[in-house]
């Protein structure tokens, strides 16, 4: 596996020197300063590459070129946004960048309710609390029909939770959900968010899939033409939220992608933390079934709680993900590719990390502090090395 590190650009509190010292050779980044829907110019791409090259690093994976909301809703200037996306792919390929991660989650990117969940050892993790989320949906957002998405017990618990919240608690929870986490290109006020939700009133899963199909049929041929590997990221968490449909949550969804545009360039990001939240997702089976289309991996583990829709992020080798089995499956796919002449390792990054040690005193991007990811990368590297020595000695 190629060891990579997500970097949010020059304003990231984790420096490129830090990245290099962590042992990563590739960087996963994006041009966050370019507005959604605009073309990524070649000169901007080359400028970012030059910045990385100064530190002996390469831009391995784009994460992400954001998909404009008008593409998802099939409205407004969606055709122009698709054309701009196509051109951005061409420009990236012209600069030698051939792997692009993206997602098709409506409105919200990845979602958490608590960005500072205190663990028993004193470190902090990200958490999704189903009851806190229900309190937001039912009592803060006050979404029409929201009660249909929660059990009676969850509704009662949410009402009690909301009743105990201060104004500061309400503001913090609201901000955590709709203000935009790292990687999300848009944040909203409550009124803006309600207006966005209304745009999806007539869009169910079938319609969102159709809108996705239009997008895929437009961009995959361009990816084939210029040699770019597209890697769609799963929904996080992998189930409908706030009445919004989700279409990248299960192995059945992956099969739909393959059938809709059957091309090796129409591939996947295997995010074990996103898919792994669902107990019915067999991660090893997913890798074995779609191995030739897995172009990028995010490795992290989550811990489901008493309410199975609640979870927090565990250490990389702990939790509900059998990380050793996952890495073995990835290495098996790499070995298969080697035997066919494809010697490029699959890019991997340690996804998220606990805020710990000195990082507890620093301002960090939630989930993306340095030390927790450094620890995770070291652990994942150790598992990979042990498996290679034992089962895959021919892999470099």
Curated annotation (Swiss-Prot):
Key words, A-Z: Iron, Lyase, Manganese
Iron keyword on record: yes
Domain of life where this protein originates: Bacteria
Function: Catalyzes the dehydration of D-mannonate.
Gene name of the record: uxuA
Pathway note: Carbohydrate metabolism; pentose and glucuronate interconversion
Gene3D superfamilies: Divalent-metal-dependent TIM barrel enzymes
Source species of the chain: Serratia proteamaculans (strain 568)
Catalytic activity entry: D-mannonate = 2-dehydro-3-deoxy-D-gluconate + H2O
EC number: 4.2.1.8
Cofactors (names): Fe(2+); Mn(2+)
Family, per entry: Belongs to the mannonate dehydratase family.
Matches recorded under InterPro entries: Man_deHydtase (IPR004628), Xyl_isomerase-like_sf (IPR036237)
Pfam family, one: UxuA
An MF annotation (GO) of this entry: ferrous iron binding
GO biological process: D-glucuronate catabolic process
Name of the protein in question: Mannonate dehydratase
């Amino acid at each position: 596996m190629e060891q990579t590190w997500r970097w949010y650009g020059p304003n990231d509190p984790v420096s490129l020197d830090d990245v290099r010292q962590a042992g990563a050779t590739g960087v996963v980044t994006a041009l966050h300063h370019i507005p959604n829907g605009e073309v990524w110019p070649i000169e901007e791409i080359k400028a970012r590459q030059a910045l990385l090259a100064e530190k002996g690093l390469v831009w391995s994976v784009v994460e992400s070129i954001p998909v404009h909301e008008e593409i998802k809703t099939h409205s407004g200037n969606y055709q122009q946004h698709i054309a701009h996306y196509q051109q951005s792919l061409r420009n990236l390929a012209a600069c030698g960048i051939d792997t692009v991660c993206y997602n098709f989650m409506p409105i919200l990117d990845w979602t958490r309710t608590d960005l500072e969940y205190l663990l028993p050892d004193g470190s902090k993790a990200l958490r999704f609390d189903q009851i806190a989320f229900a309190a937001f949906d039912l009592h803060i957002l006050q979404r029409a029909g929201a009660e249909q998405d929660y059990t009676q017990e969850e509704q009662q618990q949410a009402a009690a939770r909301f009743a105990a919240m201060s104004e500061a608690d309400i503001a913090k929870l609201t901000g955590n959900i709709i203000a935009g986490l790292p990687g999300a290109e848009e944040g909203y006020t409550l009124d803006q968010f309600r207006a966005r939700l209304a745009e999806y009133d007539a869009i169910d899963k079938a319609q969102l899939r159709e809108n996705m199909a239009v997008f895929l049929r437009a961009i995959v041929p361009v990816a084939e033409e210029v040699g770019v590997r597209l890697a769609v990221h799963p929904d996080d968490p992998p189930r409908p939220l706030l009445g919004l449909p989700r279409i990248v949550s299960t192995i059945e969804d992956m099969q739909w992608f393959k059938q809709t545009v059957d091309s090796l360039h129409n591939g996947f990001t295997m995010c074990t933390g996103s898919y792994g939240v669902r107990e019915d997702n067999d991660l090893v089976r997913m890798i074995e079934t779609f191995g030739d289309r897995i172009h990028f991996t995010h490795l992290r583990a989550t811990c489901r709680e008493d309410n199975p829709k609640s979870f927090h992020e565990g250490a990389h080798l702990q939790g509900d993900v059998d990380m050793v089995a996952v890495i073995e499956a990835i290495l098996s796919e790499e070995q298969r590719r080697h035997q066919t002449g494809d010697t490029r390792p699959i890019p991997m990054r340690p996804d998220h990390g606990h805020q710990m040690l000195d990082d507890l005193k620093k301002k960090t991007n939630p989930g993306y502090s340095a030390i927790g990811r450094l620890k995770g990368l070291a652990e994942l590297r150790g598992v990979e090395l042990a498996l290679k020595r034992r089962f895959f000695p021919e892999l470099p």
